[in-house]
């Protein structure tokens, strides 16, 4: 006997019970240890930060990380999965700053770095219990007891070792360059961090500013040879910018050497801009008084909008960093560059070397002047009228100043894409300063080549989003002017400037006259700031630089750092024992510019090869309407709410099957509820049906029931089952859970809507003959195989099926479905011809039901005929061989198979068409057909009454009735049919005994009273 199955199963409650079974029996640990002799399969876990609560997007990534290793374990692989925690960086610091009410780095300095970092350390696991609970609840099997933690000393030391390898190859340098800078956080950001913070539709100023040309410079240029100022009117160059705050630092104007420029007569002055831009700027009505190429403008000089020296700001030469004397006249040049565009602006580019990457490069190339009037907090410095204001606030003041001086040509607003800090949401500024860089551009070709060795799912990511990122790779600005992070392991001599990179603690301790290390090692600021030693070159004091590492460097170093490579002896075999490279990683698509990149870059820089082989790249989660989830829209769904209502299996199944992994997917409680109804409940109803009838008949599973001559319906479902095993195996082996899951959905649909429905009478009949036992065994085989196929996807319901159907009847069976092997298809049982024939029958039946629906003819009403137009003559044989099934499904008396292209008569036929197929039902009804339809309706009503009266499925009953003349005739004529279908011993005309269940009904417009009694 099987355990009785509740048809109204509470899935969340069932899952909690199964979690206890797994925990009590240590099933996760056993699933790994039992496969220790198998080939290793390695998952790298992208480390989350536990100082924030897990969201539904974390559920998405975790269930996709889970499905493949579960499958691999069932295929015999040894697959220990180590968790990880990302514990450093701005995400952590900002949360602590909020708790302390801090608004700047100065607040941290006053509070004390040691105390601040202590708060950071204690905050990183603030919500770890919620993470652990969610991880267990969704059945993501990962070892969190031995998880790697990026703030651990051993992890940090491996990160130091990795940087030392790059240093020794000449790939680490300090440079004065323009980098993206967060004024709120007071630190540079890497290009992959910047890529995660862009916001579309950001409103900014759009100002067109006039720069007055020095008249005396005109004669020395090509323009002076082509055009002579016919009056005393001043000549201006018109430039455009969206960052007015950078204008006080302007030291050049850039033009395109090969494009045409026009001189316009603006009545009171002349103005130069690119000729292709006249139309867009609506300046075609102004007279053109001169034309030239951009190269003719080179050599012109113009008057500064502001003389910084008047406001207490120095002006320096970029060639030698010398300061310009306060009395020296100041003028700036027109230069030619390749980056001037004719798609926007004026064709004349405002150039401020301190605040633009290309501007800085031009400054170095042409030896421009250099002006820095903004501090690291993004505030205007000096004695400007707008000093002390944040740059974005100063935009209006600067624009107003220029307008008052007659230098503002237009002042508008525009919407464009602008970078914001990926963590604190402050607008970034581009800022020239010293930073430490990893020369990733030196290995660009190796990065691109290595990417070709990685299997990406979806495939277009390889040469698309990720490939493009690698093609346009720039050097990695990895240092951060912050506090809580891996200290940059570079020491500099305070006397001679000698710099050294240290690759480990023992190496550091071996330095001459090393001192400052505390008894309890903590490789963090401020302690690491105190570690000094003597310079080998001059004997001076070697002191560590103050920066910490980009937290993306931490997570990107995990392939080595999680094992404390190369310091632990057992870590040195990672390349030979299957721990490196990873077989599989999985995260959201934005990690192409985050963790996926940092992993790939560090591995390539150190080892010259990729560190992962297969990637599932997940699309984003949207709300029910397809909009991005955000707190401001109040459309964020908390995982607990959905898990408590529908269970983890429903959420998992929805994520696997709703859309291919790389696609964005909508998510809501309603959508998960639909999956529950359409798949899980369908499967559960099959399971419940089987157990109910198997228990009635005391069925004991045995393969002998499928030996010898097997009924065609059973042969078909077993053929479909074995084809399903092949397809699911192939899908998961190809890292495509969606394709595999959808095939399971199709099969469960076949099983429920065709096999079980068409086999019901086989289960209902009283005798346990070979046909009935074959049906039981076939359905049992399907359910047990499904439990194993579903184990990687829906581990709870798979376990429930296995515990009841297998373990309860076979005490020698393995104690969990998750310890069993993945099913292996018996190809000898696959009959493609039979599969195709029955699928054709199902298609014809479905189209026939559609035609009946169009004709408003309920299925219980028998019809005289159905005509089927096929797509090829070859299909006729199979259809006619299985014609009886079509007749039963559509409740018709005759089937006519027409040749392809045959026209169906219009009169008395209603048709449904799909491609080359047409199925048409004859709508004419004879008295005999009407009577039979009424009899079927009576059967339907009696079956409903049995349920309402709470009779058992196997209970026999007596039926009593009172009817008019028409229904009296129907019941007499079809009495045997009615008795058989409703398990009625007799049908009696007249009132039933007292206590009978009764209903008064209307059958096709005729009154009928029915009584049923056991």
From Swiss-Prot:
InterPro entries per the record?
aa-tRNA-synth_Ia, Anticodon_Ile_ABEc, Ile-tRNA-ligase, Ile-tRNA-ligase_type2, M/V/L/I-tRNA-synth_anticd-bd, Rossmann-like_a/b/a_fold, tRNAsynth_Ia_anticodon-bd, Val/Leu/Ile-tRNA-synth_edit
Q: Which residues bind ATP?
A: 631
Name the Enzyme Commission number(s) assigned to this protein: 6.1.1.5
Q: Where in the cell is it found?
A: Cytoplasm
Family matches, as SUPFAM superfamilies: Anticodon-binding domain of a subclass of class I aminoacyl-tRNA synthetases, Nucleotidylyl transferase, ValRS/IleRS/LeuRS editing domain
Instruction: Report the domain of life of the source organism.
Output: Bacteria
List the ranges annotated as motif 'KMSKS' region: 628-632
A Pfam short name: DUF5915
Cofactor(s) needed: Zn(2+)
Family as reported in the entry's similarity comment: Belongs to the class-I aminoacyl-tRNA synthetase family. IleS type 2 subfamily.
Entry protein name: Isoleucine--tRNA ligase
Taxonomy-wise, where does this protein's organism fall, top ranks first? Bacteria, Bacillati, Chloroflexota, Dehalococcoidia, Dehalococcoidales
Instruction: Identify the gene encoding this protein.
Output: ileS
